[in-house]
């Protein structure tokens, strides 16, 4: 496999910014002449040679991509950030604008499956903010068929599933979440993917708690408990504590309310008001169901 010639000029920009010579970057792994031709766009490099050059400059692939994309995140990362922000703000107008742009791309490039998948995820996000908005059965089948077809889930598949939890049946959620644990073995040691896995599982846990699928909720909470979460990942740790308390409250422990309120206060203290609002709305829904269950008893 070859690295395209056009990326050579980016490597040169990074090399010169580090005040390194061609010889230092080549470092005996490839010839100086070969590296020079690559930088000038005359020839390509093999993947192994390309990674050797990055390693010799102490540059990560993510850093290279950031420069390659003109000092901005990759398109899928930008889309993910925009969606998360609009969802936290409950900004339906912004979501509809993002959707319109994605639909246009999907129509212009029908052969590119990711544009259609992105569009489905945006529609799913809209439904989470506006229950009156519906996603077609065909879209849901297209998404699930794609996820089932991928043997090893990476960042993109985790993102797709995490943001479409509200579209799927509880049985499908359990199946996918269980499969996901097996299908991310290649990537789950990457910090970014580990965080995505935790986020995905917590979304599944939320859906299960709200729909009284409590055994499954406990199954995935136990899995999370056995996952080593770094102490510095405070956001994940507070979210996990919140969901464990929410489960406890749902199964009849009124004292869990204190832990829930502490988690909400923590997010508010950190000025994460959008997150706090979403979780508070969820807790209020759970409270109503608990009261209703007590009245039935």
UniProtKB/Swiss-Prot annotation:
UniProt GO cellular component terms: cytoplasm
Where in the chain is the DNA-binding region found? 22-41
Query: PROSITE patterns from the entry?
Result: HTH_CROC1
Chief subcellular site? cytoplasm
Give the record's keywords alphabetically.
Answer: Cytoplasm, DNA-binding, Transcription, Transcription regulation
Residue ranges of domain HTH cro/C1-type in the record: 11-64
What are the subcellular locations of this protein? Cytoplasm
The terms under GO molecular function for this entry are: DNA binding
This protein's source sits in the domain of life called Bacteria
Q: What does this protein do?
A: Regulates the expression of glucosyltransferase (gtfG).
Which protein are we looking at?
Answer: HTH-type transcriptional regulator rgg
The species this protein was found in: Streptococcus gordonii (strain Challis / ATCC 35105 / BCRC 15272 / CH1 / DL1 / V288)
């Amino acid at each position: 496999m070859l690295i395209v010639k056009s990326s050579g000029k980016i490597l040169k920009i990074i090399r010169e910014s580090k005040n390194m010579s061609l010889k230092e970057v080549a470092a005996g792994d490839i010839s100086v002449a070969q590296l020079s031709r690559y930088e000038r766009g005359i020839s390509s490099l093999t993947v192994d040679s390309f990674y050797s050059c990055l390693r010799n400059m102490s540059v990560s692939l993510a850093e290279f991509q950031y420069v390659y994309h003109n000092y901005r995140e990759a398109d899928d990362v930008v889309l993910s950030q925009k969606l998360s922000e609009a969802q936290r703000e409950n900004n339906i107008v912004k979501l509809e604008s993002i959707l319109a742009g994605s639909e246009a791309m999907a129509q212009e490039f029908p052969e590119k499956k990711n544009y259609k998948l992105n569009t489905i995820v945006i529609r799913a996000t809209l439904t989470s903010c506006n229950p009156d908005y519906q996603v077609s059965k065909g879209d849901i089948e297209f998404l699930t068929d794609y996820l089932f077809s991928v043997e090893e889930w990476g960042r993109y598949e985790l993102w797709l599933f995490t943001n479409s939890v509200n579209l799927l049946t509880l049985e499908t959620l359990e199946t996918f979440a269980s499969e996901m644990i097996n299908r991310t073995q290649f990537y789950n040691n990457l910090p970014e993917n580990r965080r995505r896995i935790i986020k995905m599982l917590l979304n599944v846990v939320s859906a299960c708690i709200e729909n009284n699928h409590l055994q499954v909720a406990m199954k995935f909470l136990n899995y999370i408990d056995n996952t080593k979460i770094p102490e510095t990942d405070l956001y994940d740790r507070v979210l996990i504590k919140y969901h464990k308390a929410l489960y406890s409250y749902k199964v009849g422990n009124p004292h869990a309310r204190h832990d829930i309120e502490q988690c909400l206060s923590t997010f508010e203290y950190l000025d994460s008001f959008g997150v706090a609002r979403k979780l508070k709305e969820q807790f209020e829904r759970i409270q109503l169901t608990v009261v209703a269950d007590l009245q039935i008893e």
